[in-house]
Amino acid sequence: MSVSNFVLPKIDPVAVSIGPVDIHWYGLMYLLGFTFALWMANRQCDKSNGIWTREQASDLLFYGFMGVILGGRIGYVLFYQFPLFLDSPLYLFKIWEGGMSFHGGVLGVTTAIIFYAKKNKRSILSVGDFIVPLLPVGLGAGRIGNFINSELWGRVTDSPFGIIFQNAGPLPRHPSQLYEFALEGVVLFIILILYIRKARPAGSVAGLFLLAYGVFRFIVEFAREPDAHLGLLSLGLSMGQLLSLPMIFAGMAFIAYAYRAKAQAPSQADNVKPPKAKTNKAKKKHG
């Protein structure tokens, strides 16, 4: 063990206690992420020239939050604990035992977007473009919660950047939670904010989010310890990497579709023939 490796102290998982109520660090991170998302959504509404109202944004965020919680839990059970679920279906509802999947959360948010768009007669793509820039800060905050809880740590490393997680043995490991915080939280947020500074084709913002997150997650998974009960799967890839591949392909498809639709719009308009001008011809009289 190198003397330069930092030993992460054991931190009480309870951040704040208010009477009989304990607020855990992970829950606090969720709260911070949701609060920031609401603040940013209100800013986007104020700049939308009436296209979005704050009330509409609040409703969308509520549906999105429920999608994250329900989809994240269902995804974790189906993707990572399916044999346990088959043996004990009630495990799905044991949320207090922990276990959330980001990829399941994406499916949950997608369902929420579709539901909201249909209910309010909005474009699914435009709703997706509105909500995805709000997500990276919450993702980053969640990874900080993982780091504080000493969970989802990385693989063993001899790098001086390795950190010793006391519940993971004496060897230093990649702080993969911090890698994800940096890439999926900070860098992804900056990319999306810079991208939406100009008007973009409908669906391209959501596509960029899917593509960038999928790439970042795929890369970080090489440093993250695979789930012990799953290990590495097909082609030596982790479950997280296998689930990220569809996101990457979907993101590229969304972007290609968005820009193709934008490029075709003017040409379609050019193909519309203008109406013929009416002429007042004198009627021929018959005797």
Swiss-Prot record:
Segments of skewed composition (Basic residues): 275-287
Q: Which InterPro entries match?
A: Lgt
> What Pfam family does this protein match (any one)?
LGT
| Enzyme Commission number(s) | 2.5.1.145
Q: Where in the cell is it found?
A: Cell inner membrane
- What does the entry list under GO cellular component? plasma membrane
A GO term for molecular function: phosphatidylglycerol-prolipoprotein diacylglyceryl transferase activity
A single BP term in Gene Ontology: lipoprotein biosynthetic process
Note down the stretches annotated as region Disordered. Answer: 266-287
Q: Which residues hold a 1,2-diacyl-sn-glycero-3-phospho-(1'-sn-glycerol)?
A: R143
Please give, as recorded in its UniProt entry, the membrane topology of this protein: Multi-pass membrane protein
Task: Could you list this entry's UniProt keywords, alphabetically sorted.
Answer: Cell inner membrane, Cell membrane, Membrane, Transferase, Transmembrane, Transmembrane helix
Ranges annotated as spanning the membrane: 21-41, 60-80, 95-115, 124-144, 176-196, 202-222, 235-255
Pathway linked to the protein: Protein modification; lipoprotein biosynthesis (diacylglyceryl transfer)
Protein role: Catalyzes the transfer of the diacylglyceryl group from phosphatidylglycerol to the sulfhydryl group of the N-terminal cysteine of a prolipoprotein, the first step in the formation of mature lipoproteins.
NCBIfam families given in the database record = lgt (TIGR00544)
Similarity section: Belongs to the Lgt family.
Q: What is this protein called?
A: Phosphatidylglycerol--prolipoprotein diacylglyceryl transferase
Give the species this sequence originates from. Answer: Psychromonas ingrahamii (strain DSM 17664 / CCUG 51855 / 37)
Encoding gene per record? lgt
